[in-house]
Amino acid sequence: MIKEYRTINEVVGPLMIVEKVAGVKYEELIEVRMQNGEIRQGQVLEINGDKAMVQIFEGTSNINIRDSKVRFLGHPLELGVSPDMMGRVFDGLGRLKDNGPELLPEKKLDINGEVINPVARDYPDEFIQTGISAIDHLNTLVRGQKLPVFSASGLPHKELAAQIARQANVLNSEEEFAVVFAAIGITFEEAEYFMEDFRQTGAIDRSVLFMNLANDPAIERIATPRMALTAAEYLAYEKGMHVLVIMTDMTNYCEALREISAARREVPGRRGYPGYLYTNLATLYERAGRIRGSKGSVTQIPILTMPEEDKTHPIPDLTGYITEGQIILSRELYKSGIQPPIDVLPSLSRLKDKGTGEGKTRGDHAATMNQLFSAYAQGKQAKELAVILGESALSDVDKIYAAFAQRFEEEYVNQGFDTNRSIEETLDLGWELLSMLPRTELKRIKEDMLDQYLTEGK
């Protein structure tokens, strides 16, 4: 039931206090009708007795308390969903912004989603190919997983996000795959880059885009990832598709949370972020997964920039607790011209062993992954030793490992943002690099596998 009030008591920043309300619900959608006919939308943030605190999406500037009316609409923020969403571009509140025809929704869904019973969850165990060797082979992405990318200011996470959105796929061609892309608090130039890339490569045909710009209100940034995840859940659980949700930049989302928390005069937690930051992030990340009896799945790649490149900052720290690993971008590799600059040693996919092996990727996947990790770590150590003591101090085997590490970065990790490698190409490249090492050094691979795959004469 719609209720209308003229009892606005106070306006503070983006917040408004409405008095003498009854039957109002948390997160209920509201409309503010101004004297000049303008209508602004908002959402109930807090209820205390007969007072409601609401946040206005478009801001509170020029709102006259005496002449404005507030309507409580009786339902939370919703997204109209339909199979026709594919190929369309929405703003952060789910309104079309691509100048295309209006969308006729099949239904409207609450953007906060429904709680998934843990018992109903199915274990993630199917491979998703991104076409990026450092991810597919060494930090494998599995359907239903949440695998964040930890970047820093100035690093090419924008290009990496576009590459994953463009190239990601499932190996079974009979299964439908879709990408839901949520851009949170990005600049106009970044939005243009993503739109242009999606359109030029044709990736937009299998994608749903939500674009929230830096000059949009903070409350819209809070809604954007929820809009994207609602669209993803609809496509996955009602249309049977495997959906990859890419959200960039989650740091902007957390900054918006901090801004709203400060406006509400809440007691701040670590570095000024609200004490419920962990819980709030969990309401997003835990919407990834698979459900028993459902054909589809929701996989997440949240991308965030670490403030001051600090892994202990609350945003990457709490994200790491909730998610199943992390892909870390390295400034050192970026300066060396390695693209994408994925630092494979501190990166981790906790579910990688569940999505690899015969019938999923290839039988030699796990063994070559372990051997490459080991050899690269030894090669890095040898290179560091050479810097301190000089190359002459290295043994012959150490020199081979140092050369291996160099080639590994330049040929394996460095593939550019336009190269789409199949998992077979990646595994074959891994064997080519391992053939540099003496056979006696390949201790993590079984003899029969060495006989089958190792290049002759090496």
From Swiss-Prot:
Keyword terms, alphabetized: ATP synthesis, Hydrogen ion transport, Ion transport, Transport
Q: Which InterPro entries match?
A: ATP-synt_VA_C, ATPase_a/bsu_AS, ATPase_F1/V1/A1_a/bsu_N, ATPase_F1/V1/A1_a/bsu_nucl-bd, P-loop_NTPase, V-ATPase_su_B/beta
Query: What single Pfam family name could you report for this chain, choosing any that match?
Result: ATP-synt_VA_C
Query: What would you give as a GO molecular function for this chain, any one?
Result: proton-transporting ATP synthase activity, rotational mechanism
Q: What is this protein called?
A: V-type ATP synthase beta chain
**The organism of origin for this protein:** Enterococcus faecalis (strain ATCC 700802 / V583)
Q: What does this protein do?
A: Produces ATP from ADP in the presence of a proton gradient across the membrane. The V-type beta chain is a regulatory subunit.
Positions of transmembrane segments: none
Gene3D superfamilies this protein is in? Answer: 3.40.50.12240
